[in-house]
């Protein structure tokens, strides 16, 4: 397992939640003796929506909404067996999407 690399991608709508989850992952990996690169903040994706408030006339009256998607990237360079076991047992917040890739 020493030649592999674990890449963890985190996505969330709440930046506080994603930073807290990334910190937990980094602390867990360092505690088990692995080298960690990150968390690396990726560009924030902003989706904006314009909605007409009036059903008939007044096209100038609109509401504007946006959804921000925050992303973080964590690389674990030299994972040990303890690292993988600790990451599997780690309980993260419900609002964070986690993708794990071995490379």
Curated annotation (Swiss-Prot):
GO terms for molecular function: structural constituent of ribosome; tRNA binding. The keyword Zinc-finger does not apply. Gene3D superfamilies: Ribosomal protein S10 domain (3.30.70.600). GO terms for cellular component: ribonucleoprotein complex; ribosome. It comes from the Bacteria. Keywords: Ribonucleoprotein, Ribosomal protein. The keyword Ribonucleoprotein applies. InterPro entries: Ribosomal_uS10 (IPR001848), Ribosomal_uS10_CS (IPR018268), Ribosomal_uS10_dom (IPR027486), Ribosomal_uS10_dom_sf (IPR036838). Pfam families: Ribosomal_S10. GO terms for biological process: translation. Belongs to the universal ribosomal protein uS10 family. Involved in the binding of tRNA to the ribosomes. Part of the 30S ribosomal subunit. This is Small ribosomal subunit protein uS10.
